[in-house]
């Protein structure tokens, strides 16, 4: 094989891997492959001024301001690289553009790793897939609450959990009720005794299946209005007499996209995990990055639907996609939602999927 081709292939792989590397060397790697005179940096100061105004950003000192401006410029470079590697989506300036990669992970992700399933978890039964619709969206059927905002607290797992149970409760009762994430943040400390670091721990991360286990053991969850979200860890104030939704059972869906779609249609929105490496710069469109590690799951989200395709002129084809409800507020992505390619487990979106059934309730 031609040596020049091998070298070019190696260089592409190295650069692509650097884009999604979770180490703290992201910015250093980026500087190696991007010309310092990139035209999109010529107006960086103007972009930063607009960014501060749009997202109400302020900094206590000039030193902090100047530091954040430097981070912002690095993230402009990162967004351009993401655009090149994920051309079917739009990447650019977001509410997270003044955060380093490590700050973003620490403050806005929070999914923990787990090798074993909780005691009450079971494998979801195999469902028929022959009559699946081409498009499906639980938002159109009234089973999804408005997009919420976890703030700078690693509680994504709690929002994924409540979102799935909100949908299941709607299917069981016909009532859409916003459930309390703060109850999970404060009260859920379910652990796997055989795996170190697997405990749900509020703003320091957790797992959706752990949370379903907690809800089974505790008797359920109260409404959001009865236990409001604060975005920080607190003492448990759970009042069982105010429970409005409870878990009957929960299951883990096999790594098969047709089965995931079938479970979504039959059982309601699904709690899923994802590698969020491309989400810091995501603005809109169908995200289908060339490289995104499937095993590096670090963010809990809610799968609410799917579409048969959005035209991608760069790739000359329709790209079928999943519709993901995120918990970063409505001023991120597509009014708080994320579209990601279906078909090949992009960013591990098919790797950790759970469905929950709600108990019938008289509330």
Swiss-Prot record:
This is Cysteine proteinase 15A. Belongs to the peptidase C1 family. The keyword Protein transport does not apply. Coiled coil: none annotated. It holds the Pfam family Peptidase_C1. PANTHER family: CYSTEINE PROTEASE FAMILY C1-RELATED (PTHR12411). Disulfide bonds join 153-203, 187-236, 292-347. Glycans are attached at residue 249. Residues 1-18 form the signal peptide. GO terms for biological process: proteolysis. Residues 19-131 form a propeptide. It comes from Pisum sativum (Garden pea). The active site is at 156, 299, 326. Gene3D superfamilies: Cysteine proteinases. Induction: By dehydration of shoots but not roots and not by heat shock or ABA. CDD domains: Peptidase_C1A. One of its GO terms (molecular function) is cysteine-type peptidase activity.
């Amino acid at each position: 094989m031609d040596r020049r081709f091998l070298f070019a292939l190696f260089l592409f792989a190295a650069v692509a891997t650097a884009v999604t590397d979770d180490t703290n060397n992201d910015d250093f790697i980026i500087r190696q492959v991007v010309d310092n005179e990139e035209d999109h940096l010529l107006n960086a100061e103007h972009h930063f001024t607009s960014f501060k105004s749009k997202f109400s950003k302020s900094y206590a000192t000039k030193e902090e301001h100047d530091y954040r401006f430097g981070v912002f410029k690095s993230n402009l470079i990162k967004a351009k690289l993401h655009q090149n590697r994920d051309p079917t989506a739009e990447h650019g300036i977001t509410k997270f553009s003044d955060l380093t990669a490590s700050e973003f992970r620490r403050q806005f992700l929070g999914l923990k790793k787990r090798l074993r399933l909780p005691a009450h978890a079971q494998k979801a039964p195999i469902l028929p897939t022959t009559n699946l619709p081409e498009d499906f969206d639980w938002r159109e059927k009234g089973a999804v609450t408005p997009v919420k905002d976890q703030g700078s607290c690693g509680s994504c797992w709690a929002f994924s959990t409540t979102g799935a149970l909100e949908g299941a409760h709607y299917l069981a009762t016909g009532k859409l009720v916003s459930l309390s994430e703060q109850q999970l943040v404060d009260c859920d400390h379910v652990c796997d005794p055989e795996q170190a670091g697997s405990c749900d721990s509020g703003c320091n991360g957790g797992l959706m299946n752990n949370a379903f286990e907690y809800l089974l053991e505790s008797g359920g969850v109260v409404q959001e209005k009865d236990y409001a979200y604060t975005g920080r860890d607190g003492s448990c104030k759970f009042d069982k007499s105010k429970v409005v939704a409870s878990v009957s059972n929960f299951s883990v869906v096999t790594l098969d996209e047709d089965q995931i779609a079938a479970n979504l249609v039959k059982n309601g929105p699904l709690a899923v995990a994802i590698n969020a490496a491309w989400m810091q710069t995501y603005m809109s469109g169908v995200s289908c990055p060339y490289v995104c590690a499937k095993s590096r799951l670090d963010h809990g989200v809610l799968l609410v639907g799917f579409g048969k395709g959005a035209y991608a002129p760069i790739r000359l084809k329709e790209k079928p996609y999943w519709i993901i409800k995120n918990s970063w507020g409505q001023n991120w992505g597509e009014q708080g939602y994320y579209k990601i390619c279906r078909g090949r487990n992009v960013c591990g979106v098919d790797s950790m999927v759970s469905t929950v059934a709600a108990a019938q309730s008289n509330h």
